[in-house]
C-alpha cells in the first residue's frame, strides 16, 4: 500500500488520501480471505489484486504525465474511489475476521453475494479504465502534430483543429455513456414475419417487416458449432459493447449507423446487430457495389469532387471512433462502407435524380463489425484465403509471424488502400480496370502480386496520380496511411498501441479537414 501512496503523494490534493484508505480496505479483505476454504476466495482475491494494480498504474500515469491535472478529473477520481470504498466496505462486512489457524467455509448464500460484488468490482474497473482511456487520448487540449509535418497556423489549419476537437469531445461523451453491462440492448424475438434479402457485395441483410413495411439492416457475428462457452461469451461481450457504442454515437457526425440493439440467435450460432435506416435516407448500397457497377465505368464521374472528399472524411472519422473505444475493425474495405441516397423532399423525376447517385454520393457509414475485437484481445492470426480481401491487408498481416497480431496500424494501412480507390473512383477488385485492377496482378493475369509488391504499387499511385486527382494533401494522407509509423515516427513505437493508433488517425483527420475545394 505504501508504494502507491508514495507514488502519487503530493501530486493531487485529496486523491491520495481516499485512494490509500480505499485500497487498504482491499488489502484487509485479502488478509481475511486466507482463512476461507473455497476456490471462490482465489477469484475474489485476484479481482481485488488486479484492481489495486490497475489503479496504481493509472493514477501514477494521470499525475506524472502532466503536473497540471484538471481539477475536474481530480474530483471525478475522488467520486469514483468513494464508490470503490463502498464496495470494499460491504465486502469487509461479509467476511468477518477469524482467529489465527481457523478455517471457514464459504456458504452458497455468501458465494452468491460475493459474485454480485465481483460484478460490481469488474464494472468499476471497466468504468475506471474507460475514464483513463478518455484522459490519455482526449485530455490534452493540444492535439499531436501530424507525422512529418510542421503545424501551420493558417486559416484552414485553425478550422480543421476546431473540427477535430469537436469530434474528440463527441467521442468523449460516447465513451462516457457506454456501459458494457447494459441489458436493454438485447432485442427479444418478435412474431412478425419478415423477409430478408442480402445486399449486393455485402454480408449485411436488408429486412422488411411484412405488416408495417418497416425496413432495417442486420449484420451477423457467427461462431462455430464446436465453440467453447468462454469463446461464445467473449463474442457476447464484444457484440454488447459495440452495440452500446453504436447506440450512443452521433451517426452523421461519426459515420457509423445507429444500432437499436442485438439479438442472440442460439439455434443459428450467431448474434444479430440491428440498424434502422437513418432519417431521410434510402436505397443503401455498398461502396464496392457502386465502384463495380458497369454504369459507373460507362458514364464516369458525375458527382462533385467535394462530395468524394466528404466521403473519405466520414470513413476516417468512423475508424477513429472505433479505435478510440479500444477496438480494431480488421475489415476496412469498400464492401464495408454503406452509402445511402438522400430522399428527395418533394419527389419528382428531376429532383430525385439530382439527390441520388451518380449525381450525388449520398451519405456513407462504416459497417462490417462482425470481426471487430478489442485491440488487446488474442489474435487467431488466420491467413486470408480470399484474394479480394488480401488486397487491403498490410504486408505484416500476410506474413503472420510472432508480433504480427492485428493492431490499429493494420486498419490504417487498409484505410490507405480504400482512400486510393476513392481517389480513382474504382476498385482494385475490378481486374478489367487498367488504372487499378491490372496493377495488383502479375502481367495482367490471375496471380496476385506479393504483399511487398502490392504496397509498392499503392505508394507509386499515391505519389504519382493521386496529387493530380485529389490534391497533394490528400496524397500525403494516403501515403501516411500506407507507411504507418515508418521513418521519423519510430519514436512513437514504444508508446501504448492504443494511444499511437488514435493519435495517428487524429492527425490524418486534421490533414483531411485542412483540404479546401
Predicted regions and their residues:
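N-terminal amphipathic alpha-helical segments
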Residues: 1-76
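Regulatory helix-to-disordered linker/tail regions at the edges of structured cores
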Residues: 34-37, 41-42, 82, 86-254, ...
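Conserved structural core of kinase catalytic domains
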Residues: 257-308, 376-378, 382, 387
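Protein kinase catalytic-loop region centered on the HRD/HxD motif
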Residues: 317-327
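Residue immediately N-terminal to the catalytic "proton-acceptor" Asp
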Residues: 325, 330-331, 335
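Activation segment/activation loop of eukaryotic-type protein kinase catalytic domains
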Residues: 335-396
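Conserved C-lobe activation region of Hanks-type protein kinase-like domains
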Residues: 399-471
Amino acid at each position: 500500500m505504501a508504494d502507491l501512496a508514495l507514488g502519487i503523494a503530493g501530486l493531487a490534493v485529496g486523491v491520495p488520501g481516499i485512494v490509500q484508505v480505499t485500497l487498504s480496505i482491499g488489502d484487509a479483505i485479502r488478509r481475511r480471505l486466507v482463512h476461507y476454504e473455497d476456490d471462490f476466495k482465489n477469484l475474489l482475491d485476484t479481482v481485488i489484486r488486479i484492481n489495486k494494480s490497475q489503479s496504481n498504474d493509472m493514477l501514477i500515469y494521470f499525475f506524472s504525465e502532466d503536473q497540471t491535472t484538471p481539477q475536474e478529473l481530480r474530483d471525478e477520481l475522488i467520486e469514483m474511489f468513494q464508490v470503490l470504498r463502498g464496495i470494499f466496505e460491504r465486502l469487509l462486512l461479509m467476511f468477518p475476521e477469524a482467529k489465527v489457524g481457523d478455517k471457514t467455509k464459504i456458504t452458497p448464500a455468501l458465494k452468491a453475494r460475493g459474485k454480485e460484488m465481483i460484478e460490481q468490482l469488474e464494472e468499476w474497473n471497466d468504468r475506471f479504465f474507460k475514464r483513463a482511456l478518455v484522459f490519455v487520448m482526449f485530455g490534452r487540449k493540444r492535439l499531436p502534430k501530424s507525422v512529418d509535418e510542421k503545424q501551420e497556423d493558417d486559416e484552414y489549419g485553425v478550422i480543421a483543429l476546431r473540427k477535430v476537437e469537436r469530434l474528440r469531445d463527441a467521442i468523449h461523451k460516447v465513451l462516457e455513456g457506454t456501459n458494457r453491462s447494459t441489458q436493454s440492448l438485447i432485442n427479444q424475438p418478435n412474431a412478425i414475419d419478415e423477409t430478408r434479402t442480402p445486399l449486393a457485395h455485402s454480408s449485411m441483410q436488408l429486412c422488411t417487416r411484412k405488416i408495417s413495411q418497416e425496413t432495417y439492416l442486420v449484420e451477423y457475428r457467427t461462431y462455430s458449432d464446436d465453440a467453447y462457452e468462454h469463446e461464445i461469451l467473449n463474442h457476447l461481450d464484444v457484440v454488447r459493447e459495440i452495440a452500446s457504442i453504436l447506440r450512443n454515437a452521433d451517426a452523421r457526425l461519426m459515420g457509423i449507423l445507429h444500432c437499436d440493439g442485438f439479438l442472440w440467435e442460439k439455434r443459428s450460432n450467431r448474434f444479430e446487430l440491428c440498424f434502422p435506416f437513418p432519417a431521410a435516407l434510402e436505397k443503401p448500397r455498398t461502396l464496392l457495389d457502386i465502384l463495380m457497377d458497369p454504369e459507373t465505368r460507362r458514364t464516369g464521374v458525375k458527382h462533385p469532387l467535394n462530395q468524394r472528399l466528404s466521403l473519405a472524411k466520414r470513413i476516417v472519422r468512423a475508424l477513429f471512433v472505433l479505435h478510440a473505444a479500444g477496438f480494431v475493425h480488421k475489415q476496412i474495405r469498400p464492401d464495408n462502407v454503406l452509402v445511402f441516397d438522400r430522399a428527395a423532399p418533394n419527389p419528382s423525376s428531376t429532383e430525385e435524380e439530382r439527390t441520388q447517385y451518380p449525381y450525388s454520393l449520398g451519405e456513407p457509414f462504416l459497417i462490417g463489425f462482425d470481426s471487430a475485437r478489442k485491440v488487446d484481445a488474442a489474435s487467431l492470426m488466420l491467413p486470408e484465403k480470399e484474394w479480394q480481401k488480401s488486397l487491403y491487408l498490410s504486408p505484416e498481416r500476410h506474413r503472420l509471424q510472432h508480433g504480427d497480431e492485428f493492431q490499429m496500424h493494420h486498419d490504417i494501412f487498409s484505410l490507405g488502400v480504400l482512400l486510393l480507390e476513392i481517389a480513382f473512383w474504382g476498385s482494385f477488385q475490378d481486374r478489367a480496370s487498367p488504372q487499378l485492377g491490372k496493377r495488383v496482378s502479375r502481367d495482367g493475369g490471375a496471380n496476385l502480386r506479393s504483399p511487398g509488391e502490392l504496397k509498392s504499387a499503392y505508394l507509386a499511385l499515391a505519389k504519382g496520380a493521386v496529387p493530380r486527382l485529389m490534391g497533394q494533401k490528400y496524397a500525403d494522407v494516403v501515403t501516411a496511411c500506407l507507411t504507418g509509423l515508418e521513418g521519423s515516427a519510430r519514436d512513437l513505437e514504444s508508446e501504448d498501441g492504443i494511444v499511437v493508433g488514435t493519435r495517428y488517425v487524429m492527425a490524418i483527420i486534421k490533414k483531411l479537414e485542412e483540404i479546401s475545394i
